[in-house]
Structures are given as structure tokens and as C-alpha cells.
Amino acid sequence: MKKVGILVGREKTFPEALIRNINERGRGEVTADYIKLGGIRHDAPPGYDLVIDRISHEVPFYRATLKRMALEGTIIINNPFWWSADDKFFNYSLAPKLGVAVPKTVLLPQKDYMSGISSESLRNLEFPLDWQGIVDYVGFPSFLKPFDGGGWKNVSKVNSLEELWKEYDQTGTLCMTLQEGIDFDQFVRCYCVGQEEVMIMAYDPRKAYLSGEQYIHNPDYLSPELADRVRKDVRTLCSALGYDLNTVEFAIKDGVPYAIDFMNPAPDAELASVGEFYHNWITSAVTNLVFKRLGEEREAPRYRWDALLNPEPTRTFAVASQVEQQSRTVVPGPVENSMAAAASAPISSEVSSVNSESSVEATKPSARKPRKNGKTSSPRSKTT
């Protein structure tokens, strides 16, 4: 018998439907339930063959536990190692290299820093920050949002430099991005399951988040040609990022889909939010993915970061303790040979040139000056 564990937060209808579907289809050979976790021993058996993670991004204890389970060969949807390493600004930088359009985006230094970080710790930061150059590049309206956030948390629309400063001053220690606002003709949110199955959903981001009014069931919302491009871009992004469950949002302007957000490894799937049609689709698609992954031949993972970051369905470990090697079967040849080849292969590097624009002295600097309490922040001085 194989066991599937569901790790959840506040959501109810999606995990309950998923557990019901898996148990009905599994007929006792595959069972699903909610995981219960307490103190975890470092050498504890995982207890589950596959885990669907919906909440570890908000609970570090869960994330650490999932990494431990992955080490023992448990399939985790989504991969906790990559999820921990990923961020949205990296994704925005990656997408154009994959042929996917994105809005102009700038990563900003933090407004504040934790206690103990002084101006001496920040000597690599430019001072003053060229705010005018940044907004000239991005334009208005634009969106100030965390470089690794989700769920529309701490996202602000700004229409002027003054509004930007006001919102930026409230961001504290969050690292933020400023992103071009696309005056879209159409907007879609797309489920992607198993890096293959795609459901395009008409979506209105102007409606209240989780209100049940954002998702619109309209199969003919996009032209066939545009729908094909969107599906292609979704699969390209999710395959490159390694996410088996994700959503990708596109703001479409003049026939061009701009990828706005594509780091959503625990996407909303609640019945009241997405509606019955999309709820049933995502539940069915994830159920199919579970049985597909459980049916794939898998070996114990190699105990190396790169192998855990990008596991393959069939993986034979090549780096393990002598005791474990005596108790498990090691298949010599291809794995060891490929590792040796990889170790001796030259590392290619791509050097990209950066076009420097003439700097316009900022009206509001972002370098940090020490406060009396030991914290640092952006001063509000102005230059003339």
C-alpha cells in the first residue's frame, strides 16, 4: 500500500476533495490523509510515499520536515528545495531567456534592515539611489511588490514618484520589486499540473482577492492562436522552474501575453473562490498527477544538493555512506560516468552587457544611515 499525505493550511474544499478522489481511485492500494507532525527525528522513516504541500512556505517547521522526507525518497509536490531557493525576481530575469515576455521590473534595496546591520554593512549599496532613472525605465502606473511574496500580500499600485516613496516607506525589511503596469486588454490565470496539463482561466485581478468574483468561466475567452501561445509559455515556465503544481498569470496587451506572476506553487483551488468547474478540474488533474508519480520507477536519491533540487523519476544514488551502500543496490556505470563527465566538463559562462544610463540624482535616497537604536533605514533627505 502507498500513502499520500496532504499538508494544508486554512483551505478545506480542495484537500478534502483530493483525499476523497485519491481514496476512491486507490481502492485500498493507495490511501490519502492529512499529515500529522510532531517532533521529527533526524533518522525517522518518512511514513509517506508522496506529499502534496500547500503550506510549508508559511511554516518553516513543515518545510524542514519535507526536505527530510525528500531525502528518504518521498515525492514532494512541489519540490521543497527549489521552492526554498526560488524568487520572483529571478523568474522575471529567466523568462525572457526562455522567450516569454515580462513587464519591465527593477529589484529595489530594502527600506529597513534587522538590528545590528549598520551603514558599514551596506557599503556596496549605491547612495543616493537613482529613483528618477528607475521610474523612467519602469513608468507609471507600476506595482510595488515583494520579490518573493504571494497572495497579493504587500502589493501596491503607484501612479507617481511621491506615491512610490510613500508605499516604499511602509515596506520595512521586505525586499521589493517595482514592476511596469500593463494596461491589459485581457487577463488570464492558468493552472499547470505536472508541467503539462494547462487550464486557461479568464481572470479579473481588479476584483477582491478570494472573493469568488475573479474567475470567469469562458472557454472562448482567447483566440485559438493566443491560447496556444499561452499554453506554450505556461509549460515552458513551469518546466524550467520544475513546478508540478503552479499558476501563471498573463496580462495581455495588443496580442502579447506578459507573464505577471508565475511563482505560485500552492495556488488557490477552493470551491468558493475558483468556482465549481475549475475546482473540479484542478482536483482531477492533481489526482491524476499523484497516480502518475506513484507509478513511476524511483530509486533512492543521491545525497547531493543538485540531485535533490532536480530529482528524476528514476534516480540511483551515487554518494552515500558505506553502511547504506552495503544495504542498497548501486547500479554502476551510467550514473557514475555522467557524474565524472560533469565534473570534468568546462563551465560555460554568459556575460551580458549592461547599458548604463546617465544617472539623475535622486530626490529621495535609499542608502542607509545608522539610527540610534542600531537599525538602519533610508533617510528622507533631498538633494538640490
At which residue positions do the language-model features occur?
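Conserved N-proximal alpha/beta basic substrate-recognition cap immediately N-terminal to
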Residues: 9-121
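Beta-strand scaffold of nucleotide-dependent catalytic cores
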Residues: 167, 177-179, 187-204, 258-263
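Intrinsically disordered, polybasic Lys/Arg-rich low-complexity tracts
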Residues: 336-384
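Active-site nucleotide/adenylate-binding loops and adjacent lid/helix of ATP-dependent enzymes
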Residues: 2-8, 70-73, 81-188, 216-220, ...
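A long amphipathic alpha-helix within ATP-dependent nucleotide-binding catalytic cores
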Residues: 210-258, 281-284, 288-298, 303-319
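A short, polar/charged loop-to-alpha-helix boundary motif
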Residues: 207-215, 269-276
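Short, solvent-exposed loop/turn segments at secondary-structure junctions
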Residues: 11-12, 57-58, 83, 149-150, ...
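A short beta-strand motif that forms the metal-chelation/ATP-contact edge
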Residues: 48-51, 190-192, 256-271
